[in-house]
Amino acid sequence: MTKKQSPVISFKNYSFQYRAQKRPTLTNINLDIYPGERVLIAGPSGCGKSTLAGCINGLNPCSNPGEATGELIIDGVDATKSSIFELSAHVGTVLQDPDGQFIGLTVGEDIAFSLENSCMPQDEMHQITRKVAELVKINNHLDYAPHELSGGQKQRVSLAGVMVDQVKILLFDEPLANLDPATGKQTIELIDEIQKETDTTVVIIEHRLEDVLWRDVDRIILVSEGRILADLHPDKLLATSLLGKNGIREPLYLTAMRYAGITLTPEKKPSHADRVALPEDDVKQLKQWFQSRMAGKQESEREPLLEVKNLSFGYTKGQRTLQDVSLTIRKGEMVSIVGKNGAGKSTFSKLVCGFEDPDQGEIRFAGKDLLTENIRHRAKHIGYVMQNPNQMISKTMIFDEVALSLRNTGMDEAAIRERVEETLKICGLYPFRNWPISALSFGQKKRVTIASVLVQNPELIILDEPTAGQDFHHYTEIMEFLRKLNEEGVTVVMITHDMHLMLEYTDRAIVIADGELIADDIPARVLTSEAIADKAYLKKTSLYDLAVRCGIPDPSGFVERFI
């Protein structure tokens, strides 16, 4: 891409401070983004990247009051003197949670919403709606209700809804956070196709760096503590140690190369696993590292804790969300359940917790029939953390939310305070203990819900997407805490789209596709099986691609030994 003379987004000595905060969230930002560029903004939670995005689309200060100093020009418009309505004609925003962006009762109504507001003639409105729907490949679902769509389809509708205004800038706020790996890959491909078709400027805020880099980006803007720490081409940034030092996960294949003692340089093209250019000496070094690693040890059989036999369930008559699922979770295991959106993973957890009753099958916990027990009894032994934290939170303040279940048991207030504060420290929430929950980000709310379950000391914890919306620092903090809990005897089951989590933290992966259990194996074998990956909408790990590219004869073994 050739840079044009005038930037479409231009920050000059720009700072922003929320009215409720004592210090600026953004300090002295100088940044130019040019027409047609694709830019990734990365940084740890709370670094200011979402605030930066909010300044671009006008949410700050129009909806979130605060004081801005310096200059911000968006597509020739002075953003500091413009309304959010004026800026929306230039910037289209796709939110992290697409459910929060739906307005219409059908897909077609939702896409056409802004056109209706501008009193466009119906014939012209229908023509534009159909054209944009075709561009995002959702044209066969115009009569569907939003709740009938998958997560990836909802993202497409949200994108279409902002594209009808023919905006010059598309801003994506963590578009992959709630998507399975294959759908996330398709989303990045869609963004790539749309940008090539429309020459739109694309700004992406995302923690899943490796997934975004599936297609080229021009620059990565690294934000830390409200300042721009780096503004570099991906190959240049990935050759440094800046990502790890600032709480951001680098692509897994780069970690493997570093483990092998390989020096990364921009010339080796480290931003793509399938294009990385390693000289023969580096390839030899990687092979020697692989041969020196010991294969993982087999663990002895453990006592069964949760036993499921021939479990079937459907939300509507004649349709099965789960079909004849049988599995055993043993005491002290740390297990991942993976599969595409809508495969039946969350439904399985609802049946175990008693939120739904199965059509047929058995569920036993520690040898006892769970189907004879109510939800309250099951909750004494099984903790469940939902994917959407807003569906769990019922109190205004953080401390009160985490303390709620203990107070319901009549526990002494001093004992409650001690246990709650200990849990908040573990989850990285202690400094915010007296904050209102409304002031938290999506990822912080997620940690509140995890804390509210962990405080009860359950025998089995089921977590639905525990790391969604978390930066690498908080991801590692939560996962290391869960690993510590697991080492102390708590059984942990995680429903996840995060293949890194599955590889690094679990010894076993249960794969569900279209309501059926299709695999139950070690994660390395699951993520190196093309048949399983395709059927379950997973994505083969980049470690496998690196091993194949370097001619390692046993790519699956390479992945297993790396983990």
Which residues fall in each region the model found?
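Conserved ABC ATPase "signature" region
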Residues: D123-H141, A414-F432
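Conserved ABC transporter NBD signature motif
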Residues: P65-V77, G361-D369, R378
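The feature captures the beta-strand-to-loop junction immediately N-terminal to the Walker
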Residues: A42-P44, V338-K340
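Catalytic Walker B motif of ABC-type/P-loop ATPase nucleotide-binding domains
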Residues: L170-D173, I461-D464
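Conserved ABC ATPase signature
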Residues: A145-L149, Q153, P436-L440
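Helix-to-loop junction immediately C-terminal to a conserved catalytic motif
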Residues: N57, C353
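Conserved beta-strand-loop-alpha-helix hinge in the C-terminal portion
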Residues: R227-Y253, E516-L543
